[in-house]
Amino acid sequence: MTQHTLTRRGLLIGSAALLAGLPQLSLAQSGGPSIHVLKDPNCGCCSAWIEILEGDGFTVTTEASMGTMLMRYKSDNGIPQEMVSCHTGQVEGYMIEGHVPAADIRRLLAERPNAVGLAVPGMPYGSPGMGPESEREAYDVFLILHDGSTEVYTNYEAA
């Protein structure tokens, strides 16, 4: 019968292997970036946008909010009035206002600019959750800077 003893070296190698695998385990369990969304509970387009994000691997939690409470949340978190849309999300310290495509959110998280976040003001037809992309009208995704100014982050031409 063979007797196995645990050496310090074996313990260190095993521990290192376990720790190396933890980030992958964590990502597999979470399903991707987590975004918390404040929205009017009666808004169908907000729900459609959330379904698109979930289909793209985001983990989404929601909170019902409307009227002055929602507008105050937007303002308190650096969303300029001219950038406002129907729902507001927060992901990894960034604000996401309106029907921002998942690809732009992923790009934001990869690039990590010094900014408040992204916005698609209004509700442009054909943006995620707002009708078929094949019929979309032209719209811009804006990067909101900390001084309240904005710059075009991505331009989507009409289909």
Q: Model features per residue range: what roles?
A:
Residues 1-19:
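N-terminal secretory signal peptides and thylakoid transit peptides that target proteins
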Residues 26-28:
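Boundary at the C-terminal end of the N-terminal hydrophobic targeting segment
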Residues 33-48:
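Local sequence-structure signature of Cys/Sec-based thiol-disulfide redox active-site neighborhoods
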